[in-house]
Curated annotation (Swiss-Prot):
Belongs to the universal ribosomal protein uS13 family. Keywords: Ribonucleoprotein, Ribosomal protein, RNA-binding, rRNA-binding, tRNA-binding. This is Small ribosomal subunit protein uS13. The gene is rpsM. PANTHER family: 30S RIBOSOMAL PROTEIN S13/40S RIBOSOMAL PROTEIN S18, SMALL RIBOSOMAL SUBUNIT PROTEIN US13M.
């Protein structure tokens, strides 16, 4: 396996897909990176030369925040919102959806499994 930005990327996959295994690199950034380095997106990772891997590593680490740095920045942003007491911070603290989604129904991913409430007797 080749290592880029501290991540083992799969050798058998096409480069454009393999780059998306790095946190902070999606399909668009993978395309931009390959265009900037002049590497064919359809080539397999195992077929890349050492020089091409170095080019990819330098471009990704030089141009984007990825992996640990990005995770730390996101966590710090959330922590800051919680500390200043903003509405978004409140939603994070309560474990509810942050971006205005409905919660009367749905939102089960954020709220967790249903808490059963005893029904009213007739």
């Amino acid at each position: 396996m080749a290592r880029l930005a501290g991540v083992d990327i799969p050798r058998e996959k096409r480069v454009i897909i393999a780059l998306t295994y790095i946190y902070g690199v999606g399909k668009t950034r993978a395309e931009e990176t390959l265009a900037a380095t002049g590497i064919d997106p359809n080539i397999r990772v195992k077929d890349l030369s050492a020089e091409q891997l170095v080019q990819l590593r330098d471009h990704i680490e030089g141009s984007y925040k990825v992996e640990g740095d990005l995770r730390r920045e996101v966590a710090a942003d959330i922590r800051r919102k919680v500390e200043i007491g903003s509405y978004e911070g409140l939603r994070h603290r309560r474990g509810l959806p942050v971006r205005g989604q409905r919660t009367k129904t749905n939102a089960r991913t954020r709220k967790g499994p249903k808490k059963t409430v005893a029904g009213k007797k007739k």
